[in-house]
Amino acid sequence: MKELFKRGGIMLFDKNILQKIDEELKTYVDKDDKLYNASKHLLFAGGKRIRPYLTVVTYMLKKDDIEEVLPAAAAVELIHNYTLIHDDIMDNDDERRGKPTVHVVYGEPMAILAGDLLYAKAFEAVSRIKDNKKAHEVLKILSKACVEVCEGQAMDMEFENYYPTMEEYLDMIRKKTGALLEASVGIGAVMADCNEEEREALKEYAKRIGLTFQIQDDVLDLIGDQKKLGKPVGSDIREGKKTIIVIHALKTLDEDKKKRLLEILGNKNVKDEEIKEAIEILKPSIEYAKELMKQKTEEAKEYLKIFNKDRRKVLEDLADFIMSRIY
């Protein structure tokens, strides 16, 4: 019998599946030394496991032998954690998931190596896929996603020097955040022997949840719960991040509010009251972001209609969770 529990107010995560994913992940990092402990620091620090879970439940649209898909699911999560370790170094972040980041605890050189180790272990995981044809397809999807994540991160860093257009920003998040979510679903589809029509529908579903995932991150930074987020609310304002909310605001605000917002954005010495003031200025754009997420979530669920109603429900619920999650 499935044991489900709530996340973000939605009853959808199967504890048995999450446990199997964790057990699979442990087999890749089971040594006890500084390098492996650094690689495990974030991997078992309470992440949501959305990406490997997506791989498994996509696979379960058509198949039931979870053991077959676990190495593929683990590969996705190992890549995800590698990107997080390196992101934290590039962004100079001290905290993630309410804990000190890997480079803070182990130093930058060891953190870089820990990320590299997880990257290599992901391809070890792919090599455990028993069907060679599927392993080859998974390898193609995963390597393409890794390239796009790097391209997206580079774009994000370049945005520090100018204000991107909405189109540029959406392209960046499709790569930086969306690529690995798309890969998670695409890999599940390969492992499930989905046909071309099914794969295309799942690709469109994944594109939309990838977009809503990043937009919700941007929203939560402004109106989320600091304890649940594991980082200070408003940190994107302090850092001057060009989010979809900021880009929309700069297009739609009157000149006085725009001028005031630009004075606060990226000011490292900004006071808490000024952060609150900026959030107040951004409220209409936060609402715009929420409406866009609703639209994309409904579109995502529409693409699932070609699958069995009962089997697709968890993917529909995951789309809702990604939009409504609180951390």
From Swiss-Prot:
PROSITE patterns: POLYPRENYL_SYNTHASE_1, POLYPRENYL_SYNTHASE_2. Keywords: Cytoplasm, Magnesium, Metal-binding, Transferase. The keyword DNA-binding does not apply. Mg(2+) 1 binds at residues 87, 91. An all-trans-polyprenyl diphosphate binds at residues 96, 176-177, 214, 231, 241. SUPFAM superfamilies: Terpenoid synthases. GO terms for biological process: isoprenoid biosynthetic process. It is found in: Cytoplasm. It comes from the Archaea. Its EC number is 2.5.1.-. Mg(2+) 2 binds at residues 87, 91. This is Short chain isoprenyl diphosphate synthase. It comes from Methanocaldococcus jannaschii (strain ATCC 43067 / DSM 2661 / JAL-1 / JCM 10045 / NBRC 100440).
